[in-house]
Amino acid sequence: MLQLVLAAPRSGSGKTTAACALLVALTARGLTPCAFKSGPDYIDPMFHRAVLGVESHNLDLFFSAPQTARALYARHAAGHGAAVVEGAMGYYDGLGGVTDTASAWQLADTLDLPALLVVRPKGASLTLAAELRGLTAFRTPHHIAGILLNDCTQGLCALLKPMLEKETGLPVVGCLPPLPEAAIESRHLGLKTAAEIDDLQHKIQLLSDAAQQTIDWPLLHTLFDRPAPAAVPCTLPPPRVRLAVARDAAFCFTYAETLEALRENGAELCFFSPLADTALPDNIGGLYLPGGYPELYAARLAANAPLRTAVKSAVQGGLPTVAECGGFLYLGRTLQDADGTPHPMAGVLPGQGFKVGRLVRFGYARLTARADSMLFRAGETLPVHEFHHWDSTENGDAFTAAKANGRQWACGFANAHLYAGFPHLYWAGTSLPKRFAAAAEHYIKETS
């Protein structure tokens, strides 16, 4: 089974486009690949899903213990002929920007997988070799097994390949040529989502077609084939309660592992669109409003008054509810759009969402509960992350969030039927899904 971590010396090297090109090319070669993403990123897995038509999974060593990450990898790699784990940021960049904790390198080390390094050679030649030698000397073992030159012509690849192999001892498996027509646009939270790019499949197909011609596939298999990991089968229990889960262009930031954890605890997930649907799904015991881009769709969300009213009535009536980041903004009184115009939202919470124009609170943190609530017990601490350019006039004070550098702030609303706040939660391997499902079951019994 071909297995690799696709990493890079730094962000902006083209890891996501390279991953998608490899995934489509591997599919064309009959290997039925699966995809993973190192770290908390929501958007890159959307590209993997758009390319493959199957779930892509996050593997994050800040959120998860090593054994949990290994189990998730083994479970979702089972039955596939190839697995591509896309790294985040630079290869060794981890928690706080000054450690290798939760880095792509640490994930490669935890999973015992070789890494394929995506390198853009523009503006350097022999210096690339010096940089690569530094990367291989920085940690032992470094796990780097090969180099893929990105945005590199075949002529330049032919020139650089023998020099790089001689100077670094690392094989060059080929290149991905410059393809301006396959460029993928970005926005304030990174790349645009896969659903927003009409010609995504065409762009990825161009990259895949190029990869078929410019990558040494026998060499790739020699370097990265290894026995498939042993997986423990997961059997889902019969559903005991229905949960409404928002899913559309405005609310698209969900972890596949979170949804799986809910199903493993007896939840049937009923997806709905706050943009298009005028009512919540029937017979639900809970509501999950994930993050996304509600600020870009504020006018449309406001125009759907029946759904806003239904959500307000349900939450105020005690429906167990989880609202993360964008979902939290939706529960507020108003939300500014990208132009700064405020629009009415559900009005469950007192805050008004407004545009800041820069990252407000960014990165990993640890969230500690100040009191018992639906999801948390007083004093419990859970790893979370934040990533947003909008803020609220009322962020709540049910929790204390703390970063590794010592910075702390109060945040979040919580009670016996609610969690709402900017911090994104990762549910796999925690008590959260069990508690949410139990609260939903209790609600159904009490209201039946």
Which residues fall in each region the model found?
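A short, charged/proline- and glycine-enriched loop
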Residues: 1-2, 236-242
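C-terminal and late-domain segments of enzyme folds
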Residues: 108, 214, 237-239, 251-264, ...
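Cysteine-nucleophile active-site neighborhood
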Residues: 294-371
